[in-house]
């Protein structure tokens, strides 16, 4: 391992069983870098967790304003994220692919990751969120903002040496397709949630606080 400034340059065994296009794509993105882009990539990644928590805020706001559509959109988005990340982490430990910085020479490593590489949970979760929101609210500015954000998250994972391009592509597909399927079967899925998960949230204007009632999973 070689420390270069704020980055880590890992030396690993030169041989790898990964497809050549995957390795070449990773190297091209990872090694075409600059300090300013490093900073942007780091900042962009820090938005992932708060953005993934967005459905909670949307649901609470929908409860406060009695906006049923917003609450439904929040439930669909949260469901897409949960199903996507569950599937992704199951795949990670079935495939058990090593992170590129652990098995390739000369990969710049920005950040850290302990779980297996394939597929990318960041890309999957980001596109589950972005796709779900754009399907529920198909306004141009929402589509552009959400998809640019998700693309930045996905690209950044390769740039930072955390993933091969195929990790990100498959993660993107899993996240986007899960959100699309849930949107396509929206009515059935929301009925399923209402039947199996007794959750009621009301907003009391006088006390200016949220009251959570009957938060009981009834599976």
Where are these regions (language model features)?
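Membrane-helix interface segments
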Residues: 36, 68-72, 138-142
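Short helix-capping/hinge motifs at transmembrane helix termini and TM-loop junctions
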Residues: 64-66, 95-96, 138, 161
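N-terminal transmembrane-helix/juxtamembrane module of multi-pass inner/ER membrane proteins
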Residues: 2-57, 89-115
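Membrane-embedded catalytic cores of phosphoryl/pyrophosphoryl-handling enzymes
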Residues: 105-217
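Interfacial segments of alpha-helical transmembrane regions
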Residues: 62-84
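Small-polar-interrupted transmembrane alpha-helices in polytopic inner-membrane proteins
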Residues: 79-93, 144-156
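Membrane-water interface at transmembrane helix exits
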Residues: 58-62, 88-96, 134, 182-187
């Amino acid at each position: 391992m070689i420390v270069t400034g704020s980055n880590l340059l890992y030396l690993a065994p030169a041989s790898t069983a990964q497809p050549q296009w995957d390795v070449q794509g990773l190297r091209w993105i990872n090694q075409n870098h600059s300090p300013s882009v490093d900073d942007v990539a780091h900042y962009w990644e820090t938005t992932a967790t708060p953005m993934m928590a967005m459905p909670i805020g949307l649901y609470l706001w929908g409860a406060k304003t009695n906006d049923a559509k917003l609450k439904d959109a929040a439930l669909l988005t949260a469901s897409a994220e949960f199903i996507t990340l569950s599937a992704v982490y199951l795949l990670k430990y079935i495939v058990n692919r090593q992170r590129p910085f652990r098995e390739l020479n000369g990969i710049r490593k920005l950040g850290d990751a302990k779980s297996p590489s394939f597929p990318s949970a960041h890309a999957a979760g980001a596109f589950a969120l972005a796709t779900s929101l754009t399907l529920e609210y198909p306004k141009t500015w929402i589509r552009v903002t959400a998809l640019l954000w998700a693309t930045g998250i996905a690209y950044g994972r390769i740039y930072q040496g955390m993933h091969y391009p195929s990790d990100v592509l498959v993660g993107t597909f899993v996240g986007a397709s899960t959100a699309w399927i849930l949107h396509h079967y929206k009515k059935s899925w929301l009925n399923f949630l209402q039947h199996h998960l007794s959750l009621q949230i009301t907003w009391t204007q006088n006390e200016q606080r949220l009251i959570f009632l009957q938060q009981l999973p009834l599976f």
